[in-house]
Amino acid sequence: MTIMRKKHPLIKIINHSFIDLPAPSNISSWWNFGSLLGLCLIIQILTGLFLAMHYTPDTTTAFSSVTHICRDVNNGWLIRYMHANGASMFFICLFLHVGRGMYYGSYNMIETWNMGIILLFAVMATAFMGYVLPWGQMSFWGATVITNLLSAIPYIGTTLVEWIWGGFSVDKATLTRFFAFHFILPFIITALVLVHLLFLHETGSNNPIGLNSNADKIPFHPYYTIKDLLGAFILLMAFMILTLFFPDILGDPDNYTPANPLNTPPHIKPEWYFLFAYAILRSIPNKLGGVLALILSILILAIMPLLHTSKQQTLTFRPITQTMYWILVADLFVLTWIGGQPVEYPFTIIGQTASIAYFAIIVILMPIAGMIENNILDLN
């Protein structure tokens, strides 16, 4: 078996990725989220496949087909709620995974990091289009509002929006193409994940102290296979509690009303995992400015390697930058809360302050903190 594992053209790739892979001996549970994201992706593809068997991407029947899945299909309610809440679990793992990368300076592995940013954009696009498919009120108006933002692009904006809509409003053509894209994107994401792993295995994993761990490596199996399995069980436990006991807690009640172009919901807001970006978008009174801020809120991750001023890679031994980091985390919670509130005083001013703080901490305060720490430790 050993010979087969190491010699077979296909199996040896798996062997070098998950079995005989040399891994640092001290990586903590923060390194579990990569495998958990893989698990989330598999759950989403499988549940999505079964939903697609019963779903009809047509404005007249989409809402009814989702109702039909929940009422008439064997365990359809479970598949539907697993898919909806699976997206939430996916984003929780994503945010923790990115947060881990920021804390431990993993952005210095530039190819892996940039691939991760592309993956983040792809997952966000997939989730947005998936939210449109049930064709409830929030689906329809969310699609209308977000696609409409592209009209802020000078000169080609309006043409671009109508091209994406396939008409003069969000309608049958829009729903059909969103379903097509929503179906294909997870497979593209799977391919990108393999590239992400390919880049990661060029350098090997980072570790909590940020030092080179080549002198002290252990095989991935059994040490990290069993550790990942424990993480998977904890995730599945939380996931099933959410799905079976509180399936609608993260959803919007408005989406149980069929889409009606003649009736606008009082508060149009996206799913919770987009609220921080939505708050940043709304905090700028100019349409184009808001769109740019929205894109930059994620794209800013790409310049993190350039903003790294410290002589140490991780934040493990850097209390000043640590403080900045946790203020940033708190700021993201504030933005998430504001994104779900109506546009009125005092929420607007809180949102603007939190948006400024978000960019200021990443671009100004954390790099300065790194330089101060270098001076304190006399590392210059």
UniProtKB/Swiss-Prot annotation:
Pfam families: Cytochrom_B_C, Cytochrome_B
Keyword presence, Cell wall biogenesis/degradation: no
Cellular location(s): Mitochondrion inner membrane
InterPro entries: Cyt_b/b6_C, Cyt_b/b6_C_sf, Cyt_b/b6_N, Cytb/b6-like_sf, Cytochrome_b, Cytochrome_b_C_euk/bac, Cytochrome_b_N_euk/bac, Di-haem_cyt_TM
Gene Ontology biological-process annotations: mitochondrial electron transport, ubiquinol to cytochrome c
Note on cofactor: Binds 2 heme b groups non-covalently.
A cellular component term, taken from the record's GO annotations: mitochondrial inner membrane
Membrane topology, record value: Multi-pass membrane protein
Residues that hold heme b b566 according to the record: H97, H196
Cofactor: heme b
Binding site for heme b b562: H83, H182
Role noted for this protein: Component of the ubiquinol-cytochrome c reductase complex (complex III or cytochrome b-c1 complex) that is part of the mitochondrial respiratory chain. The b-c1 complex mediates electron transfer from ubiquinol to cytochrome c. Contributes to the generation of a proton gradient across the mitochondrial membrane that is then used for ATP synthesis.
Entry's family note: Belongs to the cytochrome b family.
Quaternary context: The cytochrome bc1 complex contains 11 subunits: 3 respiratory subunits (MT-CYB, CYC1 and UQCRFS1), 2 core proteins (UQCRC1 and UQCRC2) and 6 low-molecular weight proteins (UQCRH/QCR6, UQCRB/QCR7, UQCRQ/QCR8, UQCR10/QCR9, UQCR11/QCR10 and a cleavage product of UQCRFS1). This cytochrome bc1 complex then forms a dimer.
Protein name: Cytochrome b
Organism of provenance: Microtus guatemalensis (Guatemalan vole)
Gene: MT-CYB
